[in-house]
Amino acid sequence: MAVVRTINGDVSPDTLGVVNAHDHLIRVGAGEVYIDPDHLLDDVDKAAREATYFVEASKSWAAGGTIIDMCPASSGRGVLKTLQVVEKVPGLQVVQATGFHQQKVYLEWRQSWVNQYTVTQIADLLIADIVEGIDRFDYMGPIVERTNVKAGVIKWATAYGKITEWEKKSGQAVAIASKETGCPINTHVTAGTCGPEQARFLVDQGVDPV
């Protein structure tokens, strides 16, 4: 039977209500915030207020709503804060991502763990996010401390007009993690480019397109 892995556990797909398939509730730091400080989203009360608007609007069609928080690994995930948001908003469910943003978001990408680890090692970390629990430090290292919050979707993002070598490596790991766990992949394009190329890449890696 199909399940959706939310931050509070697995649920049936028919309980999701209205689904916001790509949003950001909490972002506590990392590359995007250094690029543009307006990307900082670390206020639980403000996030809860925004999420409440969504849930209330969703009630025109369903009992509640689900937000897919697409902040991936080492990109400012603050899953313990996200849990607090859900506690404050009745009718809200959240699915948290693992995976990767595009290369440029990782400002020190040459020294990033994606650059230094093997594809298998990277995939193992994504799999652990899904089956064990997301690292409370968001793989900003060196210590890893698993939470009870498990990832329910794998993000893979690519650059403008091309898929870089770094992104091909992250994409290989994303594909392995998806095949091993059955967790779906949600891709992110830049300015509308490389969608077909992403699909071809993932299918070539053995990901089921259905």
Language model features: what each stretch is:
Residues 2-23:
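N-terminal basic/disordered segments at the start of proteins
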Residues 16-28, 34-93, 118-149:
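Alpha-helical scaffold segments that flank or form the walls of functional sites
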Residues 24-26, 72-73, 97-103, 159, ...:
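Active-site beta-loop-alpha junctions enriched in small/polar residues
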Residues 42-49, 163-170, 194:
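Short secondary-structure boundary/capping elements
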Residues 33-43, 156-162, 185-187:
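Glycine-rich phosphate-binding "P-loop"
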Residues 82, 109, 165-169, 193-206:
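Distinct, well-ordered alpha-helical segments
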Residues 175, 179-210:
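Catalytic pocket-lining loop regions of alpha/beta-barrel enzymes
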Residues 84, 88, 93-184:
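Active-site gating/metal-coordination segments in enzymes
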